[in-house]
């Protein structure tokens, strides 16, 4: 099972350079195997609306949250505190540490923009 990072979704939604690779990855996995964090969802909302692409975010909500089996993950307060420790230990920025802790907690493979990361 995969935790799909914000940048992977954005690559496809904003039709960036590697959008076809992302599309192939998403099509190769059943939606029941895919997860995303609340943080990723809100980040996608922030970015798309700042770019004036609200319709892309609205379609994303319909496709990913309402019409598919993609699981949405939210960290607890304990997880958030753990995230701060992980961030310092591995010198990660906030969003990467958030994704790392979510993947570790739920035993997911973290699908990043240009690689797949097995969190142990």
Residue ranges of predicted features:
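Short, well-structured N-terminal submotif of metal-dependent ribonuclease cores
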Residues: 1-36, 50-62
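Histidine- and aromatic-rich ligand-binding microenvironments
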Residues: 5, 35-37, 92-93, 114-115
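A generic structural signal for short hydrophobic patches within well-formed alpha-helices
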Residues: 9-10, 41, 117-118
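Phosphate- and divalent-cation-binding pockets in alpha/beta enzyme and binding domains
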Residues: 21, 43-44, 82, 119-120
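Structured helix-beta-strand junction loops
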Residues: 28-32, 67, 106
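Short, conserved active-site loops that position catalytic residues or coordinate cofactors/metal ions
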Residues: 37-43
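Active-site-proximal, substrate-binding regions of enzyme catalytic domains
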Residues: 43-73, 78-80
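Active-site neighborhoods of divalent-metal-dependent phosphate/nucleic-acid chemistry enzymes
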Residues: 70-113
């Amino acid at each position: 099972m995969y935790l799909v990072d914000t940048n992977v979704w954005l690559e496809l939604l904003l039709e960036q350079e590697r959008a076809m690779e992302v599309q192939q990855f998403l099509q190769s996995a059943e939606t029941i195997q895919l997860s995303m964090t609340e943080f990723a969802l809100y980040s996608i909302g922030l970015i798309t609306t700042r770019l004036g692409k609200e319709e892309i975010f609205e379609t994303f909500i319909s496709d990913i949250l309402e019409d598919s089996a993609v699981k949405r993950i939210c960290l607890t307060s304990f997880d958030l505190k753990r995230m701060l420790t992980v961030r310092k230990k591995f010198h990660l920025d906030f969003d990467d540490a958030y994704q790392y802790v979510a993947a570790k907690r739920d035993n997911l493979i973290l699908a990043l923009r240009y690689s797949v990361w097995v969190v142990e």
